[in-house]
Each structure stands twice: as C-alpha cells, then as structure tokens.
C-alpha cells in the first residue's frame, strides 16, 4: 500500500497543530491493519480518544478525526464480516510482514522522532486489544530484538488459538 503502510503516520498533518507539537504527542499510525481495526473498534477502545489527523481546509490544512465514537454495525467478534474465512488466524510466522512504526513529535520543532517498531502480530492484536493488560502481555511476549512469541499460544492447534477464542462466532 502506498499511503497506509507500516512506515506511515499522520505526522505530516499532526505537526501543523501547535497543541500537538507542544504536547510531544504520539503520532497516529495510518498503517491499514492498525487503523482499520481501531476505527472499527471505535467506542470500545480502552485508550480514548482515538484521534487521527488528516486533510483539512486551508489555512491550517489539517483536520482532527476522532474515531472514538465509531460504532461498528455488527458483532466485532465475527471476523468473517470483513475477512475471508481463515485469513484472520494467526500465522505460525509473520513472514515478510512489517511491524508498525511508533513515533512522537519533538516538542518545539514538531520533528518526527521514531521510537521503534511494533511487530506485525503485536501491531494488529493491540489495535483492538488496547487495554493495559493486553498491551503488557504483548510486550512480555516480544523479545528485545522484536521477535514475537505469540504463536506459542495463539497459532492454530494451540490451546489459545484465535479460532478457539472466537469459537462459534465465525
């Protein structure tokens, strides 16, 4: 994807907001796998508000989109509403998938400061499961070099496979 890839954020628009720069605000990922899951989860996200800066009218040329009020028109547990059967399951290895860049704005300058990268599995899982406990669990199961151990419990055939956790819902 050209725009909504793991390396992109809303920094180009966010840094035009003096309040965001002054607060050294974390930038919002526009990585499709993260953004679309967060938007669909909307009002059910534990971390609120969910703000993404986007295009807006002159002279500011930015707009603030608050997706924290979005209500998905269905049961979020039914992954096959959007996903083809089986494509939402955790693969044993992430393969060539890129993790999502994490960054913030430098106070005063508005320059982008890259803090690191979340692994691809952690990125998508914590998009919906964004509470402190879930985020801590994902962090604990990620090695310092970024290797993710999620498949130990969550791949198919394991006790806590995604298909089991969503049993009867897909």
Where are these regions (language model features)?
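Flexible linker/context regions in extracytoplasmic redox proteins
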Residues: 1-71, 80-170
């Amino acid at each position: 994807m050209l725009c909504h890839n793991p390396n992109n954020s809303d920094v180009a628009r966010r840094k035009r907001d003096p309040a965001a720069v002054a607060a050294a605000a974390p930038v919002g990922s526009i990585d499709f796998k993260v953004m679309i899951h967060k938007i669909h989860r909307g009002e059910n996200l534990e971390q609120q508000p969910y703000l993404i800066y986007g295009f807006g009218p002159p002279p500011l040329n930015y707009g603030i989109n608050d997706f924290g009020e979005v209500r998905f028109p269905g049961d979020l547990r039914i992954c096959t509403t959007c996903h083809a059967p089986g494509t939402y399951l955790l693969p044993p290895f992430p393969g060539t998938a890129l993790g999502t860049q994490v960054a913030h704005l430098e106070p005063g300058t508005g320059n982008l400061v890259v803090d690191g990268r979340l692994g691809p599995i952690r990125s998508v899982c914590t998009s919906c499961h964004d509470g402190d406990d879930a985020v801590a669990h994902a962090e604990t199961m990620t090695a310092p070099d970024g290797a993710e151990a999620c498949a130990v419990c969550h791949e198919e055939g394991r006790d806590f496979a995604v298909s089991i956790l969503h049993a009867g819902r897909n």
